[in-house]
Amino acid sequence: VIGGDEXDINEHRSLALMYXSWSHRFIXXGXLI
């Protein structure tokens, strides 16, 4: 169970980082435009 929880946390963290990175690029591009 613990291993499964860690995997879920890692997946959520990866998705969060990808989303934050994408939104940051989108905002920066919008500001430049």
UniProtKB/Swiss-Prot annotation:
Gene Ontology molecular function terms on file: serine-type peptidase activity; toxin activity
Coiled coil residues, start to end: none
Keyword Secreted attached: yes
One BP annotation, GO: proteolysis
Subcellular location: Secreted
EC category: hydrolase
UniProt KW keywords: Blood coagulation cascade activating toxin, Hemostasis impairing toxin, Hydrolase, Protease, Secreted, Serine protease, Toxin
UniProt keyword Secreted, yes or no: yes
Superkingdom of the source species: Eukaryota
Recorded GO CC terms: extracellular region
Tissue: Expressed by the venom gland.
Reactions catalysed, as given in the entry: Selective cleavage of Arg-|-Xaa bond in fibrinogen, to form fibrin, and release fibrinopeptide A. The specificity of further degradation of fibrinogen varies with species origin of the enzyme
Enzyme Commission number(s): 3.4.21.74
Function in brief: Thrombin-like snake venom serine protease that displays clotting activity on fibrinogen. Shows both arginine-ester hydrolase and amidase activities on synthetic substrates. Also shows proteolytic activity toward casein.
Name of this chain's protein: Thrombin-like enzyme RP34
Organism of this sequence: Cerastes cerastes (Horned desert viper)
Record lineage: Eukaryota, Metazoa, Chordata, Craniata, Vertebrata
